[in-house]
């Protein structure tokens, strides 16, 4: 990630992805969102405990639809249901800059392959790939925009 990058973690839970990014990429700003107030509280407490000042923790509706991100890293909330998950991903991947990318860890048995197919259809100007598979999980990547063919 380039210095100054804006990174988004959707469904941050207690903050493992957001806080790891903030620790290893101190020149970046990480926005961690979750609908669960308790999860947000724990993420804030963990960020404070770690002395991180480059993390913002918020509810999704607290983030402007005009906000743009350079990267989205997430273990997305698969269990909320397919239609709700699709709405969440449509919004947040749609808020990536044209050069922005997304990386999502999804359980193979939770529909990683069908999600990759859906992402490719939903975002035809962005390449979608199964970057890596291990121990029942897939890392799905959504690349920067390219011209439509």
PLM regions and their residue ranges:
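Class I S-adenosyl-L-methionine
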Residues: 111-149
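Short, glycine/charged-enriched secondary-structure capping and boundary segments
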Residues: 23, 45-48, 86-89, 117-120
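A short SAM/SAH-binding and catalytic strip from SAM-dependent methyltransferases
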Residues: 70-83
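Conserved SAM/SAH cofactor-binding pocket of Class I
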Residues: 1-65, 71-74
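Short glycine-/acidic-enriched loop or helix-start segments at secondary-structure transitions
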Residues: 18-19, 83, 113-116
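Short "lid" loop at the C-terminus of a central beta-strand within the Rossmann-like core
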Residues: 78-79, 107-112
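Conserved beta-strand signature within the Rossmann-like core of class I S-adenosyl-L-methionine
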Residues: 99-107
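A short glycine-rich, Lys/Arg-flanked "PGG" loop and its adjoining helix->strand segment in the class I
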Residues: 86-98
